[in-house]
């Protein structure tokens, strides 16, 4: 950005390299290490350890720690925006517009892909280089038998080499030696053919024995499988029978429990009904007793009131009779209080008669004698 960039002012302090903390000997860790016998410049751990030889100055220096604030893997580099995505495709498009042939474009594309692949492998694997493996110590070269002829490959190679000698040897050797060699070669060929026949026979016998053993093994396996299946079926049948028995027993026990619970509930309901009836009867009896007591008290009070009123009336009548003049000889008709309350007196008299009669009282209160 040049002059238009943001100006960051930095003030250099007394410790610009930030090394004061490394020289501070009053920290908690320094105190603990010194108490354990450590001194500045020494390595941690046993001095006579087997790996103490490999210690260097880096083993006694400070450890650099960086704060990891992302989810990338260890050693992964984040994209800082300096990589242009799609640049190769853009170059491919420009090449087609410029009239490049398809072969050239394909070669460039392959070159770019190889470059990207190599770059990825360099980051992933690093400086590892893979080398073609050779013979290890102690390996033994074994002859591979061909399936068609049953002859080892090494024998065939030797045979071809022997049967095809060089032209220089042919010219140098005399004709007698040629005939001897031919005889020897023919004898060797006969021996090899015999060996081949023997090997073929052995293979046949081996294959027959293997087939017989395999058939016997297969029969044994079939028998074992049949036995295992029978055992499994028997076990399953036994388990099913046990399950049925358990289910029946559980059903019977559950039915018994239900019946017992039903009878208990019925009994409890009956008991509750009886208790309710008894409570109601008791309440009714109490109410009837209270009613009778009230009626008796009311009747007693009424009788007392009627008696007191009758006495008052008789007194009033006597006073009136005494107050009338007796010398005239004629009596004036006076309206007494008895005529006024005649109907009420009759009712009161009937009531008194009823209270005196016990049979009438029983009829009134509906009491069975």
Swiss-Prot record:
Residues 1-23, 147-338 are annotated as: Disordered. SMART domains: G_patch. One of its GO terms (biological process) is rRNA processing. One of its GO terms (molecular function) is nucleic acid binding. InterPro entries: G_patch_dom (IPR000467), PINX1 (IPR050656). Residues 322-338 have a biased composition (Low complexity). It holds the Pfam family G-patch. Keywords: Nucleus, Ribosome biogenesis, rRNA processing. It is found in: Nucleus, Nucleolus. Residues 153-167 have a biased composition (Polar residues). Residues 25-79 form the G-patch domain. One of its GO terms (cellular component) is nucleolus. Residues 228-237, 304-318 have a biased composition (Basic and acidic residues). Residues 218-227, 267-292 have a biased composition (Basic residues). Belongs to the PINX1 family. Involved in rRNA-processing at A0, A1 and A2 sites and negatively regulates telomerase. This is Protein pxr-1.
């Amino acid at each position: 950005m040049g002059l238009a960039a943001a100006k960051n002012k930095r003030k250099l302090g007394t410790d610009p390299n930030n090394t004061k903390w490394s020289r501070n000997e009053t920290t908690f860790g320094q105190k603990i290490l010194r108490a354990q016998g450590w001194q500045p410049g020494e390595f941690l751990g046993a001095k006579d350890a087997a790996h103490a030889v490999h210690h260097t100055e880096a083993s006694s220096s400070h450890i650099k720690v960086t704060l990891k604030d992302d989810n990338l893997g260890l050693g992964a580099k984040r994209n800082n925006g300096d990589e242009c995505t799609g640049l190769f495709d853009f170059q491919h498009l420009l090449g087609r517009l410029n009239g490049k042939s398809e072969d050239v474009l394909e070669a460039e594309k392959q070159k770019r892909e190889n470059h990207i692949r190599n770059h990825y492998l360099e980051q992933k694997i690093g400086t590892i280089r893979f080398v073609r493996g050779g013979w290890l110590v102690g390996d033994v070269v074994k002859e591979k038998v061909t399936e068609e002829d049953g002859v080892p490959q090494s024998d065939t190679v030797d045979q071809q080499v022997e049967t095809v000698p060089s032209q220089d040897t042919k010219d140098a050797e005399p004709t007698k030696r040629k005939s001897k060699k031919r005889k020897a070669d023919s004898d060797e060929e006969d021996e090899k053919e015999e060996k081949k026949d023997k090997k073929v026979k052995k293979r046949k016998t081996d294959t027959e024995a293997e087939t017989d053993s395999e058939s016997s093994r297969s029969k044994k396996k079939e028998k074992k499988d049949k036995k295992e299946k029978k055992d499994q079926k028997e076990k399953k049948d036994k388990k099913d029978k046990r399950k049925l028995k358990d289910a029946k027993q559980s059903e019977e026990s559950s039915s018994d429990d239900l019946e017992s619970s039903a009878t208990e509930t019925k009994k409890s309901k009956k008991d509750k009904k009886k208790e309710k009836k008894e409570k109601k009867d008791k309440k009714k009896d109490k109410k009837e007793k209270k009613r009778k007591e009230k009626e008796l008290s009311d009747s007693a009070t009424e009788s007392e009131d009627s008696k007191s009123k009758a006495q008052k009336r008789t007194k009033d009548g006597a006073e009136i009779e005494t107050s009338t003049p007796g010398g005239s000889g004629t009596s004036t008709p006076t309206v007494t209080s008895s005529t006024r309350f005649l109907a009420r007196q009759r009712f009161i008299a009937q009531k008194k008669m009823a209270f005196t009669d016990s049979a009438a009282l029983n009829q009134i209160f509906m009491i069975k004698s």
